[in-house]
């Protein structure tokens, strides 16, 4: 544990080339405190790679309300439920991007590596991509008065994230044979539920669609990156990024047919969109969007049908741009329309892909493609702004040799 503390301290020192204001407690408490789990004012969740429930008794499963966004959403793990802490970002020139996933998820245990996983994907300016997946021996989530820290580790590597209590600041640190360094996020938004309400809300649920949940601790943020990848510097400032929490009672393959994600920042505007297509309620769409202006919420909706009274939005994939992926869906961008009849306000944002940031192939032309791009938009009739965006388009195949649906009407 002392080695991990020293590692985090050394990573903070190496990142001094980026000027960044961290919560004052972090360096005092987390970088010099006693080992993880020793502070009685903190709550600790420790899970090893093969640790899970040995019975069919019900487990704790979070469904929203005032449950802290960073807390584990299920304890203990069972054979179907899994969760993810996800961070992503894109550089200001839309030529570099990252996506990191911290997993407690038994659905990949069929590979023989246990229930813990960390995935790292980065886009280089020349268009090549770096990816690695590590399988930790254990993970620790420590929730303290000043924030939450997670560590996924094994003897040969460690990954960590730290998020301030107000969910406005985050940093991710990693030390592996191939990648070392730190990523920072500084929120341009407020933590939100699928219904658009701001955390905490006693009346909100995290269920975005049947058996699948999300919340966004950091919907949109400024991103700064200071990494070394295979001995080469990987650095940017003033990018865009964010953090999501995703979890489900069953696997993604069981719950989802598809997903679309947009995260953008343009002028005073920050926007987050997630739209899911259900595999349990076949083909039903479950969209959610939130718009922030100067960090404050100004629009949110789950409605995509026109209305004379209720706020609604539309999002349309475009296919006439210059950059697409290798999968069947050749999307090159998105067009977003947000309408508030009551406020007599209307916003539009048009995104064009600039780079293919990441891609994972699930067979038959299906899978996920993530893009870095540029956005132009703002309130109709007023000044328009140019900015950067990160998007993802995901479709699942109807059948897979690796995964089977875990749901039945008697589940």
From Swiss-Prot:
Q: Give the range the annotation lists for the signal sequence.
A: 1-17
| Listed pathway(s) | Mycotoxin biosynthesis
Q: What molecular function does GO assign, one term?
A: isomerase activity
Q: Which UniProt key words apply to this protein?
A: Isomerase, Signal
Main EC class of this protein? isomerase
Per the UniProt record, one Pfam family is: DA_N
Q: What EC number(s) does this enzyme carry?
A: 5.5.1.-
Q: What does this protein do?
A: Diels-Alderase; part of the gene cluster that mediates the biosynthesis of the cytotoxic leucine-containing cytochalasans, including aspochalasin C, aspochalasin E, TMC-169, flavichalasine F, aspergillin PZ, aspochalasin M and flavichalasine G. The first step in the pathway is catalyzed by the hybrid PKS-NRPS ffsA that utilizes 8 units of malonyl-CoA to iteratively assemble the octaketide chain before addition of L-leucine by the C-terminal NRPS modules. Because ffsA lacks a designated enoylreductase (ER) domain, the required activity is provided the enoyl reductase fssC.
Entry's family note: Belongs to the Diels-Alderase family.
- Recorded protein name is Diels-Alderase ffsF
Taxon lineage: Eukaryota, Fungi, Dikarya, Ascomycota, Pezizomycotina
């Amino acid at each position: 544990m002392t080695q991990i503390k020293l590692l985090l301290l050394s990573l903070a020192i190496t990142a001094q080339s980026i000027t960044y204001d961290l919560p004052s407690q972090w360096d005092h408490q987390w970088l010099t405190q006693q080992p993880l789990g020793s502070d009685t004012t903190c709550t600790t969740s420790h899970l090893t790679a093969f640790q899970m429930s040995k019975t069919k008794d019900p487990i704790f499963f979070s469904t929203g309300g005032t449950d802290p966004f960073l807390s584990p959403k299920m304890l203990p793990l069972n054979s179907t439920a899994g969760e993810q802490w996800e961070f992503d970002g894109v550089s200001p020139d839309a030529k570099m991007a990252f996506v990191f996933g911290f997993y407690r998820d038994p659905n990949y245990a069929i590979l023989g590596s246990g229930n813990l996983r960390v995935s790292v994907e980065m886009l280089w300016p020349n268009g090549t991509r770096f990816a690695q997946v590590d399988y930790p021996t254990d993970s620790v989530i420590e929730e303290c008065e000043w924030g939450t820290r997670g560590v996924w580790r094994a003897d040969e590597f460690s990954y960590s994230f730290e998020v301030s209590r107000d969910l406005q600041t985050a940093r991710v640190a990693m030390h592996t044979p191939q990648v070392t360094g730190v990523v920072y996020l500084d929120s341009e938004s407020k933590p939100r539920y699928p219904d658009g309400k701001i955390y905490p809300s006693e009346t909100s649920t995290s269920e975005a669609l049947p058996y699948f949940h999300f919340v966004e601790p950091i919907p949109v943020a400024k991103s700064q990156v200071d990494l070394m990848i295979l001995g080469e510097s990987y650095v940017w400032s003033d990018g865009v990024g964010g953090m999501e929490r995703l979890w489900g009672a069953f696997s993604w393959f069981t719950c989802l047919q598809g997903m679309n994600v947009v995260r953008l920042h343009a002028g005073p505007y920050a926007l987050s969109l997630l739209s899911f297509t259900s595999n349990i309620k076949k083909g039903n769409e479950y969209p959610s969007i939130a718009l922030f202006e100067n960090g404050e919420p100004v629009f949110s909706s789950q409605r995509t049908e026109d209305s004379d009274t209720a706020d609604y939005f539309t999002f349309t994939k475009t296919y006439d741009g210059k950059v697409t992926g290798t999968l069947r869906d050749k999307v090159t961008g998105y067009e977003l329309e947000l309408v508030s009849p009551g406020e007599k306000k209307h916003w539009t944002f048009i995104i064009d892909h600039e780079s293919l940031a990441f891609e994972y192939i699930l067979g038959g032309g299906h899978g996920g493609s993530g893009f870095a791009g540029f956005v132009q938009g703002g309130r109709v009739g007023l000044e328009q702004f140019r900015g950067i965006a990160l998007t993802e388009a995901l479709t699942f195949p109807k059948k897979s040799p690796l995964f089977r649906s875990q749901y039945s009407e008697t589940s």
